Swiss-Prot record:
HAMAP family xrefs: Transcrip_reg_TACO1, Transcrip_reg_TACO1_YeeN
Cell compartments where the protein resides: Cytoplasm
Protein origin, superkingdom: Bacteria
Pfam families, per database record: TACO1_YebC_N, Transcrip_reg
Bilayer-crossing regions: none
Record-stated family: Belongs to the TACO1 family. YeeN subfamily.
NCBIfam families, A to Z: PRK00110.1 (NF001030), PRK12378.1 (NF009044), YebC/PmpR family DNA-binding transcriptional regulator (TIGR01033)
Record InterPro entries: Integrase-like_N, TACO1_YebC-like_2nd/3rd_dom, TACO1_YebC_N, Transcrip_reg_TACO1-like, Transcrip_reg_TACO1-like_dom3, Transcrip_reg_TACO1_YeeN, YebC-like
Name the record gives this protein: Probable transcriptional regulatory protein SGO_0454
Length: 238
């Protein structure tokens, strides 16, 4: 599984680097986190978490600072979180998380993305029950046992720790992701490839040929929407 996350990170980093929409999406997420609490990341753990993720996605500092400055101002722009679930070709499933200032626009766009790209929208809960919500932390290393012990000593609810090809992947209860990151940093680990709350599929499907091409197009269209923050799937390599 560690290699899977490394591959996903490499793929997304290549895409993110050429996609200014990613900067805008993180700008909104940073603004919302800063607006909900203190605009200082040292006292607002939710904001610090988003900023760390933005840095992993190579979001420039000026974009981060601009979003925080906007939150410090008098703007009253509000954003609403949403979740949509649906199906792609040949047993593929998707969960789409959104953050939007216009719920009607976003719902219509997500529905159109599914309908025009070989997918079908499902009812709430039709897909998510086949996924598990977990915290995921990925970093360089090879001693999974010592990391597991370290996290247990820090009273972190750890689901699993895997080591593969020089990469360690930690899975935690979603509520303990931040605690895990803090414990790892205090142990001397400074660089992380992934620090995310993820929806992990209980089983994966493998697509090929036309099915894979159709699925890739569906995911691309969804991720290109300015209101879509995350797309989770049960397809290998995604």
């Amino acid at each position: 599984m560690g290699r899977k996350w490394a591959n996903i990170v490499a793929k997304k980093t290549a895409k993110d680097g050429a996609n200014s929409k990613v900067y805008a999406k993180f700008g909104v997420e940073i603004y919302v986190a800063a607006k909900k609490g203190d605009p200082d990341p040292e006292t607002n753990t939710a904001l610090k978490f988003v900023i760390d993720r933005a840095k992993q996605a190579q979001v420039p500092k000026h974009v981060i600072d601009k979003a925080i400055d906007k939150a410090k101002g008098n703007t009253d722009e509000t954003f609403t979180e949403g979740r949509y679930e649906g199906f792609g070709p040949n047993g593929s499933m998707l969960i789409v998380d959104t953050l939007t200032s216009n719920v009607n626009r976003t719902a219509a766009n997500v529905r159109a993305a599914f309908g025009k790209n070989g997918g079908n929208m499902g009812a709430s809960g039709s897909v998510s029950y086949l996924f598990d919500n977990k915290g995921v932390v990925v970093f360089a290393g090879d001693d999974a046992d010592s990391i597991f012990e370290l996290l247990l000593e820090a009273d972190v609810d750890v689901d699993d720790v895997e080591a593969e090809e020089g990469t360690i992947t930690v899975y935690t209860a979603p509520t303990d992701l931040h605690k895990a990151i803090v414990a790892l940093r205090e142990s001397g680990i400074e660089e992380f490839q992934v620090t995310e709350l993820e929806m992990i599929p209980q089983s994966e499907v493998e697509l090929s040929g036309d099915d894979l091409a159709t699925f890739e197009k569906l995911v691309d269209v969804l991720e290109d929407d300015e209101d879509v923050q995350k797309v989770y799937t049960n397809v290998e390599g995604f």
